[in-house]
Amino acid sequence: MRKTIKYLLLCIVTIGVLVGCSNSSKEENVESFIKKLVSYNTYNNMVSIEEAGQLIEDYKSRFGEYLTEDAFDLLMANRIFSKYSAVISDASGVTDINITKTSETQNDGYIHFEYEVSYKLERDCETVDMNDYMAFNVLDEKGYKIEKVSILDKTSSIFKEFKK
């Protein structure tokens, strides 16, 4: 009887650890994607926009490990990468990146995360405070890749800075 109880407790603890680690991996994937998206170093040595085919491959090599093909294609179609590239490349640096998870919802087959991302753009002699609001669907399969990315355009600073 004692062996059975010990075995059951060991199984429960093991399952708890595995579930906790897998959820952590999903969050790490999203947060790594966000850091790369807003990082100044990401856009160094980018090919020019005139070389469209090469530019797509360049973005894919930088962000492809985090995204499914559909998510990558949608971000390209919405010009999200080019907007971040234009705004961040115009700055002399990005500092104080702060990523805050504001929501997590478990759904059938994926987890929905929402984040508030704040950072500072350094320009000439000024600092611009940026706040972007992002939502992600992360698949339970496919190595925890991001299936969907939404950036709220009414409240996110990146769109206001891009229009300037």
What is each PLM-predicted segment?
Residues 127-145:
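A short, surface-exposed beta-strand/turn
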Residues 85-124:
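Surface-exposed, charged secondary-structure patches
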Residues 9, 25-37, 105-109, 113-121, ...:
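N-terminal hydrophobic signal/anchor transmembrane helix of membrane proteins
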Residues 23-86:
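Core segments of small alpha/beta cavity-forming domains
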Residues 1-8:
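Bacterial N-terminal signal peptides that target proteins for export
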